[in-house]
Amino acid sequence: MVLLESEQFLTELTRLFQKCRSSGSVFITLKKYDGRTKPIPRKSSVEGLEPAENKCLLRATDGKRKISTVVSSKEVNKFQMAYSNLLRANMDGLKKRDKKNKSKKSKPAQ
């Protein structure tokens, strides 16, 4: 997995979307990041220790290539604006789901 800066992550994410435009999927995950790269040992778990600054870890993959970035709380507004514009621009290939007729199954159970 490649850890990139925020701007580089957005450009690589755009490339992933362009590559998967005709066929394929891009999976994006977002989670809280505390700065650790190793797991916490079970016996000495530190529950009261909070990081000085909250961070978010974003990961994106198309199944073959993985990219990730860490966004600090100071730059989250700037990143979110650029990220939302990127998502709006690249989610034009979505298909509407076929809604099944629910009237057949709507009888109340007695």
UniProtKB/Swiss-Prot annotation:
Subcellular location: Cytoplasm
Main subcellular location: cytoplasm
Segments of this protein annotated with the region Disordered: 90-110
Keyword Cytoplasm: yes
Pfam families linked: SRP14
GO annotation terms (biological process): SRP-dependent cotranslational protein targeting to membrane
Phosphoserine: residues bearing it: 45
GO cellular component, one term: signal recognition particle, endoplasmic reticulum targeting
Stretches of the chain forming a coiled coil according to its record: none
Quaternary organization: Heterodimer with SRP9; binds RNA as heterodimer. Component of a signal recognition particle (SRP) complex that consists of a 7SL RNA molecule of 300 nucleotides and six protein subunits: SRP72, SRP68, SRP54, SRP19, SRP14 and SRP9.
Name assigned to this protein: Signal recognition particle 14 kDa protein
